[in-house]
Amino acid sequence: MLVPKRVKYRRVHRGKMRGEAKGGKTVAFGDYGLQTLESHWISNRQIEAARVAMNRYMKRGGKVWIKIFPHKSYTEKGVGVRMGNGKGTPAGWVAPVKRNKIMFEVAGVPEEVAREALRLAGTKLPVKTKIVKREEVGGESDEG
């Protein structure tokens, strides 16, 4: 699973999820991408589940790029613990993803296989998603 090697601070503020993604809105590496239509926190377990679903369907053919990383920790208080007494202990890692961000990219497989693999990955995530082609999102084309 994806986790940071080390972080400066174990506990971080939640922050805001306003607006859309500043970068990462184009299909840069692959031919097809999975674009989010909502802003949300995506956990490292959800990213891993989506990756496994894609790789299983593609039968280890093609290449997958994961363009998000869970660098933000979230905390939880224990069950039955009263309010106050500081922030809880870190419970896991999330990737804050804003709308229109390309989360996964796929290349090296036929279009039907790529679309189905990305659809399966989308079912593992807590956001509405859309499958996009390189040309549809303003990615660089091969024609010169």
Swiss-Prot record:
GO terms for biological process: translation. One of its GO terms (molecular function) is rRNA binding. It holds the Pfam family Ribosomal_L16. It comes from the Bacteria. Keywords: Ribonucleoprotein, Ribosomal protein, RNA-binding, rRNA-binding, tRNA-binding. InterPro entries: Ribosomal_uL16, Ribosomal_uL16_bact-type, Ribosomal_uL16_CS, Ribosomal_uL16_dom, Ribosomal_uL16_sf. GO terms for cellular component: cytosolic large ribosomal subunit. Part of the 50S ribosomal subunit. Binds 23S rRNA and is also seen to make contacts with the A and possibly P site tRNAs. Belongs to the universal ribosomal protein uL16 family. This is Large ribosomal subunit protein uL16.
